[in-house]
């Protein structure tokens, strides 16, 4: 047999094991011989590691080690019967080819390399693939499982030298050979060493304990006694600095100070709070302080200079600073207090990094002067909103309990402490001025009254004396809500209209556009969130009448802290959607990656869901056309990989009409849209999508190897998806699916074409019944080209209550084979069409069939005498068909391998370009790096759907061809040569008989006797005995020839019939159901990619 080479696979390990053209000459020939009849799992590291890294110890590239048996053995997991048991409740243990132990946690997709590995690693399963066997030297399975893992195991590896041209090459996993960066703060290290020394020297601890007691005894109960604290710290320092135990500490005084502070903080703090009791700043009376009251300079600006946007930015910083200052109450040291204070001021002034939402905002404060007075005013609001109860105590602590007194006088900390001191003085001066207090009390009371009237708990919806509140209408609460926003959220629409109409100059359109809460919600977003549609319509009417299109687009697409626009909050507000839909940016995504259209599709609780979905889709489509583009389905995929098809509850035909649509797309959990519909029983969607020719019905979820049938719990759902399975089957007659176990008894759902009222029927049949049916058919058709014995044996092994990925793969393969098998049987009319109505019908047909078979006369009673001419004719007929079948079998073998490699090389092409793009972006040369961004590839020469269908049909046809070829081979090369052998012996016996007894017409009977002379009688007896022996041999040979001839004749007749059936099946299968279907499907799918 000539040697031909298949294309090299990208992954060196997969290529070395499965793609060897001459295994008998390979350095791995012993490994191949060991694995020849065994099933195994291959662990395969990513190609990028095997191609671009080398082993630290041997200095050899990893792709060279892939041809080393010792290296490969650790990646091959041998399978036993336990490999099929589901291990959801326990780990699954495997043994490698060289005896090492590997544990797989299937549920978590994790592999642990344990006993035998010199480096124990935790590996992540990146992907699970089923590799159809295409070589001729592995006979243990038709398919092999490959688990792609995140890194190599059992070796230390580093990048090859040529990767140095890439900067920041960080593809080395955490377990790879690399020097760790363990930089530790020296002061923290000294502190740890200092405390350790104290703990192992109790005498020192006792001395320090005495000093702690001295402070508690000497310091008065209402005086923190800074001098006493500093005295005992200095005393401890003097006693320890000369001790050899502490001579190596460069910051000994600071360490002692911090240690004393840690142990005496509670005592100091209790004295401080007692000392300032009755004199602390009471922020309760200032709870209604607002930005407009403290930043009067901003509000007094000219109309052209004042921007409400600046105020909203200030509000956000106030909120961040207030939240941070609240942590001051949780501090227990000078360092912690100073850190909180400085960070609070930084957040307030905007000098530190804000959250992601604020980073997207323009810094309006850059155009404003943040002088000391402004900062103090803002800090006053921060203190009020943080509700600090011991402000003076914190200030005193910061001023007196530092280990370095100069730190509170200079630098950023000094500025922060002086600002806090100024705020405390502000409150003290404010309280001393009776006029200020009276004014503040009046303002506070007025604000409280107005807010009470605007409260949702207040039934009134109007304010008769609105003019009395004119001076506080610019009030904004701590959430950044204006009076307008409060009216909207509390549904005070009459008051809202009064304010907008009577105080139009105080609330110009420009301010309405810039009015936002601290979380970025505009007035329109607030109205939609509160369900106040009346207020929303008022606002929209004002905007449409007064704003330009550019202003409308900008306003409607403003985002809150979740990156949501007003459109993301629309669920059932049809009128509002129609009025602002043309201004919505339909591609804008929120923080979850959801577009407005996606959010509307996900809003399942709206009463007019289908109408809302249809309207939103039409408006979005119009928006795309307005921007000179077609609707792009890929724009609307969220951060979890869910597409619009995944989330749409009903009415999916509006999406199925799109041309560039992948209806089999998986989300990040591996779920296709069909799986989601089946899981949540969305029958209308199931009905629509199963009619689409692009659907891959049995798409497999990578992490679990579930198909849509595994998510189906309802008979109506199983029937619906089963109907699509029938249509996709070989001849569109029957489909096996959904194998289940009940007390170790396996059952399967069978959907078949029905002659009843409904075109399809789905029934549940026991697999033992199917097995019995196959045995009955095999008895009627012993020379069938269908490999029924194989299916019967495989059904016998279905005794596992639960299955892992390995078992699921076998079950899926068996169900596919049974589907093909019974499609052929129905196509050839070997069984009746209505056989699968129910299980009773199958059992009844089997009994009737057995009875008919028993009534047939046996062919052995009247053996057929075959002449050499007839044998020659049969031999010529069978030889011709055998040659044709052998040639066709060889062609199928090549076609199967080509189809497998088209898919494998397509995946290799994609992986190679992904790796190239990733490496290209890391090139040190920026110009060269940017060139990789423009690489566009189209590796899909053929559609996944058409390839999978064609490969399955070719594999099945090849199995049938091999089965038929084996029968022909037995008759042609065993039975017929045996007949010719016996025929030659028969002729030789006749020749011997005629030579010995030339005058005998036929052999005498043994009963013929006559009286003879004694001597003559003796001679005659010997002659007769010899003649009788030859006669018996001739008779036995003649009987054997008749039996062999009869057997050949019957086999020939049945084989002739089976060859006819095979030719009919082959033509229909290959031409109509395979090649034509492949071309049609592939053309239609690829047209959508053009």
From Swiss-Prot:
SUPFAM superfamilies: Pseudo ankyrin repeat-like (SSF140860), VPS9 domain (SSF109993). InterPro entries: Ankyrin_rpt-contain_sf (IPR036770), UPF0507/Ank_repeat_27 (IPR051248), VPS9 (IPR003123), VPS9_dom_sf (IPR037191). GO terms for cellular component: early endosome; late endosome; plasma membrane; transport vesicle; tubular endosome. GO terms for biological process: early endosome to late endosome transport. Gene3D superfamilies: Ankyrin repeat-containing domain, VPS9 domain. GO terms for molecular function: guanyl-nucleotide exchange factor activity; SNARE binding. It comes from the Eukaryota. Residues 289-436 form the VPS9 domain. Disulfide bonds: none annotated. Belongs to the UPF0507 family. PANTHER family: ANKYRIN REPEAT DOMAIN-CONTAINING PROTEIN 27, DOMAIN PROTEIN, PUTATIVE (AFU_ORTHOLOGUE AFUA_1G09870)-RELATED. This is UPF0507 protein SCY_4172. It comes from Saccharomyces cerevisiae (strain YJM789). The lineage of its organism: Eukaryota, Fungi, Dikarya, Ascomycota, Saccharomycotina.
């Amino acid at each position: 047999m000539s040697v031909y080479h298949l294309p090299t696979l990208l992954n060196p390990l997969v290529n070395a094991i499965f793609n060897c053209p001459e295994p008998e000459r390979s350095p791995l020939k012993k490994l191949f011989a060991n694995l020849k009849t065994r099933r195994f799992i291959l662990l395969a590291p990513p190609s990028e590691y095997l191609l671009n890294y080398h082993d630290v110890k041997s200095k050899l590239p990893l792709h060279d080690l892939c041809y080393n048996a010792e290296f490969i053995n650790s990646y091959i997991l041998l399978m036993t019967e336990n490999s099929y048991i589901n291990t959801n409740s326990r780990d699954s243990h495997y043994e490698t080819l060289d005896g090492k132990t590997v544990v797989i946690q299937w549920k978590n997709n994790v592999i642990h390399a344990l006993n035998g590995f010199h480096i124990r690693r935790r590996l992540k399963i990146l992907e699970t693939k089923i590799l159809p066997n295409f070589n001729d030297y592995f006979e243990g399975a038709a398919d092999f499982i490959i688990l792609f893992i995140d890194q190599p195991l059992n070796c230390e590896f580093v990048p090859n030298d040529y990767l140095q041209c890439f900067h920041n090459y960080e593809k080395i996993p955490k377990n790879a050979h690399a020097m760790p960066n363990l930089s530790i703060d020296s002061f923290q290290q000294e502190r740890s060493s200092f405390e350790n020394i104290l703990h192992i020297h109790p005498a020192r601890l006792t001395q320090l304990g005495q000093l702690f007691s001295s402070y508690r005894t000497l310091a008065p109960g209402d005086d923190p006694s800074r001098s006493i604290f500093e005295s005992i710290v200095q005393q401890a320092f003097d006693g320890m600095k000369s001790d050899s135990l502490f001579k190596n500490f460069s910051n000994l005084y600071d360490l002692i100070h911090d240690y004393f502070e840690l142990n005496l903080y509670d005592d100091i703090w209790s004295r401080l709070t007692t000392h300032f009791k009755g004199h602390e700043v009471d922020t309760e009376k200032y709870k209604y302080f607002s930005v407009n009251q403290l930043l009067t300079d901003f509000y007094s600006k000219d109309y052209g200079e004042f921007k409400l946007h600046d105020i909203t930015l200030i509000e956000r910083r106030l909120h961040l600073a207030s939240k941070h200052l609240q942590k001051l109450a949780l501090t227990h040291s000078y360092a912690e207090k100073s850190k909180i204070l400085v960070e609070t001021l930084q957040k307030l002034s905007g000098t530190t990094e804000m959250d992601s939402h604020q980073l997207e905002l323009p810094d309006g404060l850059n155009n404003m002067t943040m002088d000391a007075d402004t900062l103090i005013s803002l800090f006053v609001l921060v203190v009020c909103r943080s509700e600090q109860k011991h402000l003076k105590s914190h200030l005193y602590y910061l001023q007196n309990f530092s280990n370095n007194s100069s730190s509170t006088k200079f630098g950023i900390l000094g500025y922060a402490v002086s600002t806090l001191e100024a705020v405390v003085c502000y409150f003290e001066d404010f309280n001393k001025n009776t006029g200020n207090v009276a004014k503040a009390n009046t303002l506070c009371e007025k604000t409280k009254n107005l807010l009470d009237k605007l409260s949702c708990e207040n039934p009134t919806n109007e304010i008769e004396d609105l003019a009395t509140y004119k001076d506080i209408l610019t009030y904004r609460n701590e959430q950044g809500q204006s009076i307008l926003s409060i009216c909207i959220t509390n549904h005070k629409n009459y008051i809202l209209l009064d304010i907008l109409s009577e105080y139009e100059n105080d609330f110009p359109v420009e301010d309405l556009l810039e009015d936002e809460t601290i979380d970025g919600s505009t007035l329109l977003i607030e109205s939609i969130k509160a369900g106040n549609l009346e207020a929303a319509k008022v606002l929209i009417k004002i905007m449409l009448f007064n704003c330009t299109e550019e202003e409308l687009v900008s306003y409607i697409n403003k985002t809150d802290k979740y990156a949501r626009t007003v459109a993301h909050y629309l669920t059932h507000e049809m009128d509002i959607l129609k009025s602002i839909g043309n201004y919505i940016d339909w591609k804008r995504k929120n923080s979850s990656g959801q577009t407005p259209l996606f959010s509307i599709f996900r809003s399942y609780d709206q009463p007019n869901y289908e109408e809302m979905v249809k309207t939103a889709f039409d408006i979005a489509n119009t928006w795309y056309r307005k921007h000179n583009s077609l609707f792009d389905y890929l724009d609307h995929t969220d951060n979890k990989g869910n597409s619009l098809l995944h989330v749409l509850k009903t009415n999916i035909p509006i999406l199925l009409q799109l041309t560039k649509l992948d209806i089999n797309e998986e989300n990040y959990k591996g779920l296709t849209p069909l799986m989601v519909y089946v899981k949540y029983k969305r029958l209308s969607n199931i009905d629509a999508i199963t009619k689409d020719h692009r659907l891959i019905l049995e798409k497999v979820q990578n992490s679990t190897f579930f198909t849509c049938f595994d998510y189906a719990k309802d008979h109506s759902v199983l029937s619906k998806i089963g109907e699509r399975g029938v249509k996709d089957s070989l001849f569109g007659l029957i489909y096996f699916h959904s194998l289940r176990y009940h007390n170790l008894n396996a059952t399967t759902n069978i959907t078949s074409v029905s002659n009843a009222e409904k075109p399809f029927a789905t029934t549940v049949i026991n697999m033992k019944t199917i097995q019995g049916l196959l045995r009955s058919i095999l008895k009627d058709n012993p020379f069938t080209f269908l490999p029924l014995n194989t299916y019967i044996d495989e059904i016998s092994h279905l005794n596992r209550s639960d299955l892992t990925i390995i078992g699921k793969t076998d079950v899926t393969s068996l169900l596919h084979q049974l589907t093909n098998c019974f499609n052929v049987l129905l196509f050839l009319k070997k069984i009746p069409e209505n056989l699968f109505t129910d299980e009773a019908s199958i059992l009844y047909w089997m009994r009737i069939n057995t009875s008919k078979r028993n009534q047939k006369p046996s062919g052995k009673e009247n053996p057929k005498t075959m002449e050499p001419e007839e044998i020659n004719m049969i031999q010529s007929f069978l030889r011709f068909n055998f040659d044709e079948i052998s040639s066709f079998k060889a062609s199928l073998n090549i076609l199967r391998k080509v189809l497998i490699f088209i898919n494998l090389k397509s995946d290799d092409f994609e992986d190679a370009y992904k790796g190239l793009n990733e490496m290209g972006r890391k090139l040190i040369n920026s110009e060269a790096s940017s060139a990789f961004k423009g690489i566009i590839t189209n590796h899909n020469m053929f559609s996944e759907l058409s390839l999978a269908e064609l490969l399955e049909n070719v594999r099945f046809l090849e199995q049938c061809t091999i089965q038929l070829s084996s029968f022909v081979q037995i008759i042609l090369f065993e039975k017929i040569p045996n007949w010719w052998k016996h025929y030659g012996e028969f002729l030789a016996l006749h020749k011997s008989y005629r030579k010995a007894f030339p005058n005998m017409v036929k052999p005498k009977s043994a009963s013929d006797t006559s009286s003879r002379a004694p001597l003559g009688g003796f001679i005659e007896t010997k002659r007769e005995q010899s003649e009788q022996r030859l006669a018996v041999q001739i008779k036995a040979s003649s009987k054997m020839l008749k039996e062999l001839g009869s057997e050949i004749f019957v086999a020939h007749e049945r084989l002739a019939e089976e060859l006819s059936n095979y030719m009919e099946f082959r033509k229909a299968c290959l031409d109509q159901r395979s090649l034509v279907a492949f071309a049609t499907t592939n053309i239609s799918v690829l047209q959508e990619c053009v």
